[in-house]
Amino acid sequence: VIGAQSPVTVGWENIPKVQGGPVKQFIFTWFQPTMLFALLAFWYYAPNSLAKASIALWVGFGFNALLLGLEWVNPRYASWRLTWKELVTDLFYVGLAYTLLRMASYYIGSDAMAKAIEHYFQQDKFTWFTGLPLLVQALLIFFIFDFGQYWMHRGMHSWYPLWLPHSVHHYITQLNINKGAVGNPVELFLIGLGIGGFFDFLPRAALLAGVLKLTTGTYQHINVRFNSPRWWRFLFTTTEHHSLHHSQDYEATRSNYAGSLIFIDRIFGTCVDGEAELLGMEGGRRMSIREQMTYPFTEGWKALKERFGRSSALPAQ
């Protein structure tokens, strides 16, 4: 039963709305769709001199900075407000993501996988794909990547060897703009695996797919209260959905696995509409960076010793 171990809110009708005047309510109702369509239009019509990955990187930084500002203007929960201690910890992981993890992805991760696949397949085999309208290409790339992430994430909650590195991410006790980067490097590497790099031969479509990911998936880990339109809540993963996934209630964590497209959860029966304020594990115990780095290995070693130690202790028949 969801909510048996920790308080959660289930059902959109029970979730608080944005309070304030009509201007504030308008902004926090239509901000998400506006940013989605505005950035899509920008990258769709931008000249080739601007349609580059380097420009996209700076656009992403700017978008995250804007959301960081909104966290101070209209926080979802005061208990999630960013502190200096949380900020310093988060920036350590953000730096890790843009350095070591990016290098790992290039040499042994999704980028390497994409190059290996391209080595065995001729690009002319995909002329049917390149002939599709640009937005359709982008939507398909976006869906394929998120579909893979859904099953990787669900597998992490179902198989203990994968759960060990992922469990570190579930020790976070609040959501904010940088929390998506917090976790054990092994888990962050695995969750980033996909075939997105396989579509590098379609740079504009890949950029548009990245915009779709940026303007829908980023909201998983932010401390902002939105009055998201009903169609948005049906299609995309919201902070509400992901807070429920991060709650201290075990049954609630077995829901809402999709990174951006919550309707994938709806298809497979793992979607729960709701939210939670109390996040984390072990009653909200906060992990140090050192423990986050070593936890999967120390716990894995304990599990192995317990399993094989018990087997060797059994008397011979």
Feature map (PLM): residue ranges:
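N-terminal membrane topogenic signal
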Residues: 16-34
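Membrane-embedded catalytic scaffold of the fatty acid hydroxylase/desaturase
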Residues: 92-282
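Short, hydrophobic transmembrane alpha-helix segments
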Residues: 41-54
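Transmembrane alpha-helical segments that serve as helix-helix packing and pore/cofactor-lining elements
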Residues: 69-90
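Hydrophobic core of alpha-helical transmembrane segments in multi-pass integral membrane proteins
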Residues: 31-44, 62-68
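A membrane-cytosol interface segment of integral membrane proteins
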Residues: 278-317
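Loop-to-helix transition at the N-terminal end of transmembrane alpha-helices
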Residues: 51-66, 85-90
